[in-house]
Amino acid sequence: MYAIPYEYYEKYKIRRYGAHGTSHWYVSSKVPELIGKPAEGLKQIVLHIGNGASASAEIDGKPIETSMGLTPLEGLVMGGRTGDIDPAAVFHLIRNAHMDVDELDDLFNKKSGMMNCSLVTSLPSYIIQMSSGVIS
């Protein structure tokens, strides 16, 4: 849930949904097998890192929190998505850059993220180049 009036959840279903569920489920189900312990009692942070990226907190093999929200736009910075951004940035761009909703959607979902901040086109490539000192 978000800290907005509950009526918006009821009427418009605005809440955190998360994404990459199959990937998170697979990883969290493999960990007990790999470490030889049951899922019950395990606390995990599971990461999905690709051109899209997300994190989940899991207890007993079940997700209790996710980095993503209503859409995959919220959360970690991704290949082409902003990740978390101050909502006031939207108002600022509407007022000062005279952008409309479709332009902002395109900017935040396709023309931002790692590929536009660093000129590297994927998160795995970015991580490899960062760790090898090619970019900083």
Q: Model-predicted segments: where are they?
A:
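A mobile "lid/hinge" subdomain adjacent to the ATP/sugar-phosphate binding pocket shared
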Residues: N96-S136
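Glycine-rich phosphate-binding loop of actin/hexokinase-like ATP-binding domains
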Residues: M1-R95
